[in-house]
């Protein structure tokens, strides 16, 4: 059944075309997951009785947010960082991907369904890795049983391996095989390989049958080939998609396979939806979600495949799937400042990997927000906390009607008493996202913007007389309420305007949203565009004081203040301490607690620690996950500067430094260029040089003990000082 024409790559740059297809694949993944997430776990019968067919988002009908943290999204965009973190190896080893799991996953909190050893396949594989069992044995059926190892999870994280190898299905298949074997085995790995090969091939080939034929050639599993052949046969003769769903239920339901979420039923349903949906993006997702089983997984994979194959325009043929999403996504992981992300940022990451693997160069835009893809808004929306009438009537992209990129803001009837504003989330939402005993986990993140950083933006005014603008932040106060701080009004002249704004001090409290407000004394209607917007580098002086400075009404029973939530903790216990600021506590090795992001380059981190029971304690800098960082620590009467890389801890410098129990010391760790300096009570005691980590977050390290920490500060080191 061949109904689609072969895709011919135009004469223009293949890399530009692949970039657009990658963005469409990322968007398709998000749309599919968000569409299917609302009915994940529902039976086919219950979906049919409640909704009939699911053509569009139904999250509001089940009282759940649309944008949620999801294992399908976080795992997909995390695990492929094994490429970036290890120099983009073309010959990817399963062990490398397994080490990446351990670096970014926060146990019992992020990415995975934490259902228990022998119940959740991914949780089981994580525990194997943690125990020192390397991949691929960590995911083997010999160790974990066939029921565990042949579950669906092998393919749900697989899309980025395909998008990192556009037009190279052979290498995509090899990488997918290595990555899938971290947690799975047998038919689950083969199904993941087939899907990755099809997605990589879809960059240059759009015919459904050709893609399926190729996918079947790269797998090593005759039974899976037979099942796929049967699915294709049923789809060819079916009068309606429900006829195929009935056949799948009779022959390949969960009752036919071991485990709680087997691969084969879902893979068969995914391919049936792919075939029956033809070139209709919405139709394919409708079938995948309306058919039950693992709805978000199947729809997410299908959305990515068809996004790549059909392009962004196909996502816009039916209802507005893109508007409610606004490119937003959570990539929940130990690298907390990277959690709040968007489809453009993740597309850049994938493109960087693809370019490196193919020997090409890729220079992404310098600004965080450059809106370079068709219709991209990168999370900017009409500000949901705008007070009074909203004067901005539409948010879009200049590139939908012309050659330029930029966030287009249309405003109407601005005047005294009526302003307009847009904003973008920079930290977790006040509304909970988790649900106990499910894979609905809470957002674990650090803010992406901090007090005393500098916002730089280029705004283009199209009218002869334009409204003034001002930047603003909305931050959490010590009681968890939202407060707004606005900057001064800035005049816009027709044409492009370069603006800067120093983010005001929040006394260490986290910033929830950053926005731009339009203000006019006289009635104004028209449009402006944000061409780019960025903040980068460590904050000038981000300072957190004592616990009561942060939360004046704090009690000993308050354990989840938003300023505590701004840190990502792998330590077993991390909470406010009413006598200092933080309580750092961990019963084993490598209890890491961090905040900040990957654009923090040269800075000093400092805190006052009281040396209670501990094996090791100190400060972390340039953390890129929780198993890749520098630290200045005190351990066994010795001061050390260490570098951790996965399981390896290297001492870069050390000296004897006798100290007594309950002694209070001010520790400071500086990273500037390749130079690391460790100071105690204002005196430098150690220095070292290393080039492994150029930037990253800051925080604490605690091992086998509990230590109170009073205050926390991060101060930028100027370029001249860093180089001097």
Where are these regions (language model features)?
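Extracellular glycan-recognition regions
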Residues: 489-498, 510-724
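Structured, active/binding-site neighborhoods that engage oxygen-rich ligands
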Residues: 1-487, 506-544, 603
